[in-house]
Swiss-Prot record:
Annotated ranges, domain C2: 23-149
Region (Required for interaction with PRKDC, XRCC6 and XRCC5), start-end ranges: 442-698
Stretch list, region Disordered: 1-21, 477-551, 565-586
Name this polypeptide is given: UV radiation resistance-associated protein
Compartments, record wording: Late endosome; Lysosome; Cytoplasmic vesicle, Autophagosome; Early endosome
Keyword presence, Zinc-finger: no
This protein's UniProt keywords: Centromere, Chromosome, Coiled coil, Cytoplasmic vesicle, DNA damage, DNA repair, Endoplasmic reticulum, Endosome, Lysosome, Phosphoprotein
Annotated coiled-coil segments of the chain: 200-304
PROSITE patterns in UniProt: C2
Region annotation (Sufficient for interaction with STX7) ranges: 199-268
One GO BP annotation of this record: symbiont entry into host cell
Amino acid sequence: MSSCASLGGPVPLPPPGPSAALTSGAPARALHVELPSQQRRLRHLRNIAARNIVNRNGHQLLDTYFTLHLCDNEKIFKEFYRSEVIKNSLNPTWRSLDFGIMPDRLDTSVSCFVVKIWGGKEEAFQLLIEWKVYLDGLKYLGQQIHARNQNEIIFGLNDGYYGAPCEHKGHPNAQKNLLQVDQNCVRNSYDVFSLLRLHRAQCAIKQTQVTVQRLGKEIEEKLRLTSTSNELKKESECLRLKILVLRNELERQKKALGREVAFLHKQQMALQDKGSAFSTEHGKLQLQKDSLSELRKECTAKRELFLKTNAQLTIRCRQLLSELSYIYPIDLNENKDYFVCGVKLPNSEDFQAKDDGSIAVALGYTAHLVSMISFFLQVPLRYPIIHKGSRSTIKDNINDKLTEKEREFPLYPKGGEKLQFDYGVYLLNKNIAQLRYQHGLGTPDLRQTLPNLKNFMEHGLMVRCDRHHISNAIPVPKRQSSTFGGADGGFSAGIPSPDKVHRKRASSENERLQYKTPPPSYNSALTQPGVAMPTSGDSERKVAPLSSSLDTSLDFSKENKKAGVDLGSSVSGDHGNSDSGQEQGEALPGHLAAVNGTALPSEQAGPAGTLLPGSCHPAPSAELCCAVEQAEEIIGLEATGFTSGDQLEALSCIPVDSAVAVECDEQVLGEFEEFSRRIYALSENVSSFRRPRRSSDK
């Protein structure tokens, strides 16, 4: 078959051959019968293949694809299908046709169309074969592709593969119209008797139809004559049925009416009961409204009291936090070193072995400051602090890998336990970071203990941590000095040693109230510096203005034990202390009583009967003031154990004649510096902390 060939005209029948006859033992699917009435359409086409393509381009192999076109007697229309490209093949077999990508209005019932096969290389294709195909004129090739001719196109239909027909010599034209079939498939047609039976059956059916029509007409005529009487009977029966239905409905409605009337009476009785109950409840409601108005007034008063108390609590909390900045001042020197109460505390990674004593003291101050801040802010610390001064510890209750005995870590260097000490300092820094986070402050470096704490107090709590600013004073209520002067018992009775003292707890509600009341403090001593005026022969009783509060308290306790003098008047500033060497009641010049770290001057008369500079001048007419931080220090009396519950009964408030306005805290800070110095000396040499005996020359 050559290119650009066209086949048409009458389609001859194929000669007899193996494709037309069914051989014995062949499968049933191999049966193929050529019928003149068989029609092949475009919708029956499944795939197309080409064999033995002649290449005129000089290439050994070609890239090929085909296109399908509709046509008529005059022209060929635009392609309606294009196949994929088969590369490097002269015997391509393209995929099955996809009718889904063909135009929707494509007429698939046509049996004539044009096939064009294109070939080339690198997108340069040219027409190789063009064939106008009549599907009815194709020859059946079999269930498999067989091709011997050049440029042969094979069409795959539903029952097998078809190709171009070829002329067969040696067969007369008369045999071309013969149909070769199997004898087993041939049978006889109808005979005369069968046709007669069919004719008689048709006649009977016709006669039956005529009879049916006749009977139908008779029935219609009878119905037409009796239609009037039937209508009357129908209406009569309908009326009887309606009467029966209405009677039944009447009985049902009567019964329903009786039930509704009974229910109405029941509802009326219930309504009367509810009306009486409503009247009773209405009266109660009026009483409750009156009570509600009173409760609203009480609630308003309580709300105002709550707001006032809450505001006072907030102010008091800020005052206490401000007091902490006076008790534990954090300073920065020119070398960028931070000190708490005058004790240097480097960052956690800069600790040195030679500074173990000062580090323990500074960490004790810092731990107490952090624990008190958390107590005032009501923020529980994640790692609880056990305050023991310079032997404070901290617990880790979070880490589940630790046993109960291993949860407590020291905040002081302890021999070879350097790792536990470092971890304890780390937990302390974590507590500081927790407080900072509670107030919206970040902690980029945990190692800076005092810088983080100072920054937190100044920016988070709005409290200044240095010791150079002046505190505000608060008014102190007036009180008669005789009330305090008449207290039984002095401080000399039962004063325990500072290192063995334990805090006594209140056993009754009255004692608890007494413990909450701040006792008098060293306010008069802060007003004017205490001047020690020694007498002849009493060189051992010389007291410096900034002496240690601990030593002064011990001396004062020993002297009171010897003399049995009531110290209540000495604290209030109304009476002078009696000297053990002067039995006649002469005033001891220059004697200073120390209470909780502060010297309290007594009334001292000079030789000429005049008051000394250290004496106090009561002013009962004016309401005097003392600093908030000084008033708070009075609570330390009960905390340090220098007084008992009975002695605190007389210290319920600060007497007016001993409370004065204070503008600076130099003496208080001096006391703290002296105490810090002695604590540091204790860490270096325990013997230096002891007070020299009276018999010594010091």
